[in-house]
C-alpha cells in the first residue's frame, strides 16, 4: 500500500499529462478491466512445446494495459491485484498462492514499465517503445524470479527434487541442463511470446476498446 501511494504521488509529479477522471469513474474502469482480466486469467492454458505443463500462458495483462494506458501506472497495480483476487474467487488456487503471486509480480513487471514510458511521452511511438520495454523487463525479471524463487518453491510445493523439474524442461528443450538453461530456454521464450502477443493486441485494440468502454474522446 505504501508503494502504491508513493507511485501515485510520483505520477502526479512526473506525469502531469495523465488523464484526470473522477474517483468513481476510476474505480469503475479498474473494476471492469480487472473483471475481464480475471476471466482471461481463468482461461490460461499450458504451452508444452515451450515449457512444462505447470507453466500456463494467459493474456490477462491485455485489459490491464488498456486500463493503464487510460488511467496511468498506479491503476495497473490495483487492476493486477483485483484480477488475482477475482481469479481466486472464480477458480481458487492449485499452487498454494505461489502461482498467483508469480502472475501478479511478473504481470506488474510488464505493465508498469510500459505505462510509465507511455504516459511520460504520450504518443503512439512511445506506446510501442513502452510495450517493447515492458516485454523485455518482464522477460528478464520473470526469468530471474523463476530461478531465484519460483522453481525452488514449486519443487518444495510438489515435494519433488528441483532436478526433476529441470528434467521436465530437458524433455522439451534438449539444451536444458540446469536452472539457468531452464529459464533461458523455457521461461524466457514463454514470457517473450506473451509480451509480444499482448503488445500487438494492445496497439490494435486500445483506441477501439477505450472509446466504448472507457469513454475515450481523444
Task: Label the model's feature ranges.
Residues 1-218:
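Loop-helix junctions at membrane interfaces
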Amino acid at each position: 500500500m505504501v508503494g502504491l501511494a508513493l507511485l501515485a504521488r510520483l505520477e502526479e509529479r512526473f506525469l502531469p499529462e495523465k488523464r484526470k477522471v473522477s474517483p468513481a469513474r476510476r474505480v469503475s474502469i479498474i473494476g471492469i478491466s480487472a473483471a475481464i482480466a480475471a476471466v482471461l486469467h481463468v482461461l490460461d492454458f499450458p504451452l508444452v512445446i515451450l515449457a512444462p505443463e505447470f507453466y500456463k500462458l494467459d493474456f490477462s495483462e491485455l485489459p490491464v494495459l488498456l486500463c493503464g494506458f487510460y488511467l496511468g501506472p498506479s491503476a495497473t497495480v490495483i487492476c493486477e491485484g483485483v484480477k488475482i483476487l477475482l481469479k481466486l474467487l472464480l477458480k481458487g488456487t492449485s499452487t498454494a498462492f505461489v502461482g498467483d503471486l508469480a502472475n501478479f509480480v511478473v504481470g506488474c513487471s510488464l505493465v508498469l514499465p510500459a505505462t510509465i514510458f507511455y504516459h511520460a511521452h504520450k504518443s503512439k511511438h512511445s506506446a510501442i517503445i513502452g510495450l517493447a520495454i515492458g516485454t523485455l523487463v518482464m522477460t528478464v525479471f520473470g526469468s530471474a524470479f523463476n530461478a531465484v524463487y519460483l522453481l525452488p518453491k514449486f519443487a518444495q510445493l510438489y515435494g519433488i527434487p528441483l532436478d526433476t523439474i529441470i528434467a521436465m524442461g530437458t524433455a522439451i528443450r534438449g539444451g536444458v541442463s540446469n536452472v539457468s538453461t531452464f529459464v533461458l530456454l523455457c521461461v524466457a521464450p514463454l514470457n517473450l511470446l506473451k509480451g509480444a502477443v499482448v503488445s500487438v493486441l494492445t496497439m490494435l485494440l486500445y483506441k477501439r476498446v477505450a472509446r466504448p468502454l472507457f469513454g475515450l474522446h481523444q
